[in-house]
C-alpha cells in the first residue's frame, strides 16, 4: 500500500515511478522525444526593451531587473545514466573548490554546544563557524539555536536525518529563519548543508496562530543571493513558511516582465524531506540554474494562509525562476504536487524541466499557471513559457481541506505556452467521488501544448479524462498523440470551441461511456483512433462516427 509519509525514502522514487508506468522505456530516448515535441512550432515572446545597467550595480543595488527570454537549455546524462543539467559539471568543480577551502574541520561540541534539546547553543555555533572556510561537524543530539547565518566557504554537516537536529529556540520570533546565509545584499557563495534535521519549532506558537510573517521569512532554510550552494540529505520539520527556499533577497511584484535582482544561482538540493510546512515544501523565486533531485515533500499544515485557502505545494517553482530541473521527486497530500507559476504582478517561472515525479493524493498533481493572465480581458503573459515534463505520475488526486473550493486534477495548464509532456500516467480511485470534474485540463489561453504517451485509468466518477477548454478564454494549438484511456471517465477527450487541435493514436476503452473523442470544431489532423465502449465514439464538428471522419 502506498502511503508516502514523512519517512518515505526519496531514493526509491525512480523505481516507484517506473513500476507505476507499467511499461519500460529508455530515459535518454524519452528525453529526446520530449525535446522534439517541445521544438515543434515553439512560440517566443516579443522582446522586452532592455535598460543598460552595469552588472555590478544591478547585482548590489538595483531591486529589479528585466526578464530575458532564453531558449530551453539542454539536459545531459551523467555516468550513472541520471539526467542532469548541462551546467552540473561546473557545479561539481565548485564543490571541489569548496572542499579545498574547508579542510579545517571543527566540532560544535568543542565550542560548548550541548545537544540536550534545552541549552541555547547559538553562541557555540557562531564561534565554530567564525568567518567561514571551515567544515563544521554537528554530532548527534538536539541543538537549540536562535538562528544561524552561514558565511561563504562553509560546510555544515550533521550525522544524518533524525540523528542530528537543529531546532529553533522557543523564544525566537515568528519571522526567524532557522538557517540562512550571512550577507543578503553582498551575497554569499560556496555553502553546503547536509545530513541534518531542521526543526522550526512551530509548537512555540499558539495553535491557531498564522505561522509566518510574510516575504521569505519563517523558513527552515533560506538561500538568498547565494551562488554555488548544496543542501543534501536534510529534513525540514514544520516550518512556518517554507522548508527550503532558494530565492532573491526580496520577492518582487513590480510587474510581469521584471525579476528581482540578487537571486540565487547554481544550487543543488538532493535527498530532502519536508512536512508540516505552512506554505510550500521546496520553492524557488527569482533564481536560476537550480537542480532538485530525489526529494519528498508531504502533509503541509497550510498555516501560513487563511484556513481553507492554503496554496501549499510540495514543489513550487515560482515568480521569476528560470532554468530549473526537478528529477525523481515525490509529493503527497499537498495542494499542488508541482506548481510552476507566478503571481499576476510578477514574471512567470520559465524553462522548467520535470524528469520523474510521483504525485500521490495531491489536490492538483501538476499545476502550471500565471495568475491574472487567464481571461481575455487580462494582459497576455510576457513570460509564461517553456515547460517540459518526462516520466511523471499522478496517482489519485483528491479534494483537500487545504483549499476547500479546489477540485482535484491530475494536471492543469493555464496561460503557459510551449509545454511538452511525455510519458504521463494518471491513475484514479474507482471508489472515490470526483464529482464529474475533468482529470487533465488545458485552459485559460494556454498555447502550443503537446501531450504524448499519456494514459488514464480508473477515474470512473470524473467527468472527462482530457478536456481542452474552448470559448472566449480558449486554449489553442494543442497536439495529442499516443493517448490511452482504460475504463476511466465517461467522456474521453473533449475539445472545446475555437481550439486548433491535432489528434493521433488514441486508444480508448470504456463501459457505457458517453463519447470517446469530441471536438466542437474540425481538427487539423485525426488518425488512428481506436475507440470502443462509448455511446458516441467520435464526434467532430457535429458529425458522429465509429471511424475517422
Task: Enumerate the language-model features and the residues they cover.
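Extracellular "leader-to-stem" segments immediately downstream of a signal peptide or signal-anchor
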Residues: 1-137, 144-145, 151-155, 161-220, ...
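Flexible loop/turn segments at secondary-structure boundaries
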Residues: 144-146, 290-291, 347, 374-376
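Intrinsically disordered, low-complexity Ser/Thr- and acidic-rich flexible linkers and loops
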Residues: 252-261, 374-381
